Amino acid sequence: MKRNERLVDFTNFLINHPNQMLNLNELSKHYEVAKSSISEDLVFIKRVFENQGVGLVETFPGSLGGVRFTPYITDERSLEMSQEIAELLREENRILPGGYIYLSDILGTPSNLRKIGQIIAHEYHEKQVDVVMTIATKGIPIAQSVAEILDVPFVIVRRDPKVTEGATLNVNYMSGSSSRVENMTLSKRSLSIGQNVLIVDDFMKGAGTINGMRSLVHEFDCLLAGVAVFLEGPFKGERLIDDYKSILKVDRIDIANRSIDVQLGNIFNDK
């Protein structure tokens, strides 16, 4: 394999194995070249990735030395992607009866999910995250996107237990918007003691559901790494949680004029 061919293949390999430690000896054998050649390739890839804002390439010395690619986006690109999605949310045909917002097409488009996943993963890439948690059903594609970039598993909390998940742990929680007591469940095999859990969801009003998932994290003797939501909806009153990050925020839904006031979420407050 010629060097230019190897560089293309190597670059693709790194991108498809984010946050994984790759052994230099194994890479040398795979490409049938000396470790010094692999190191030279990495210098070139590292420079291009950092200049283009693709991610960070780190090398680790020693006989068992390796390389790790950590994808990230610049704050400017994160802001740009959020504004692109905000424009979609401002479309007047998104307003549903009762003041709800139609999100299925946005959360069903892979390119949008990739953007949402990148923004959330960028916010938490320097923190220890072992597992991503969400609740069925619309939070699942977001959780999968974030988990893929962080290279960690994701677990799904359900409101109704599934027989295929075996023994479960259940908690009751108070819905923040309707003040009803509801139930959520998670398989006992999903989490291990001491894991750092990042909670993600598609939409938040009173934060009752997220508060319930937070209770589940503590019931499993795990640690909360953070809470991130795609869209923060308008809510009159006090939310059940105040420590969270949101990509976008809906300040007001004007049903009469069929307009939605969409602003950037607090994830951009310090950027």
Swiss-Prot record:
Q: Which organism is it from?
A: Lactococcus lactis subsp. cremoris (strain MG1363)
User: What is recorded about the domains?
Assistant: Contains an N-terminal DNA-binding winged helix-turn-helix domain and a C-terminal regulatory domain (or effector binding domain) resembling phosphoribosyltransferase (PRT) domain. However, the PRT domain lacks enzymatic activity and serves a purely regulatory role by binding effector molecules.
The lineage's top-level taxon is Bacteria
Its biological purpose is as follows: DNA-binding transcriptional activator that controls the expression of a number of genes involved in the synthesis, metabolism and transport of purines. The PurR regulon also includes genes involved in nucleotide metabolism, C1 compound metabolism, phosphonate transport, pyrophosphatase activity, (p)ppGpp metabolism and translation-related functions. Acts by binding directly to specific DNA sequences, named PurBoxes, in the upstream control regions of affected genes. Required for growth in the absence of exogenous purines.
Tell me what this protein is called. Answer: Purine biosynthesis transcriptional activator PurR
User: What up-regulates or down-regulates this gene?
Assistant: Autoregulated.
According to its UniProt record, which protein family does this protein belong to? Belongs to the purine/pyrimidine phosphoribosyltransferase family. PurR subfamily.
Q: Which Pfam families match?
A: Pribosyltran, PuR_N
Q: Give GO terms for biological process.
A: negative regulation of DNA-templated transcription; negative regulation of purine nucleobase metabolic process
Q: Which UniProt keywords apply?
A: Activator, DNA-binding, Transcription, Transcription regulation
| SUPFAM superfamilies (UniProt xref) | PRTase-like (SSF53271), Winged helix' DNA-binding domain (SSF46785)
GO MF assignments? DNA binding
Q: How is its activity regulated?
A: Binds to DNA with both high and low 5-phosphoribosyl 1-pyrophosphate (PRPP) concentrations, but activation is detected only with high PRPP concentrations.
According to the UniProt entry, the coiled-coil residues are none
List the residue ranges of the region (DNA binding domain): 1-71
Q: Does the keyword Amino-acid biosynthesis apply?
A: no
- In the UniProt record, the signal sequence range is none
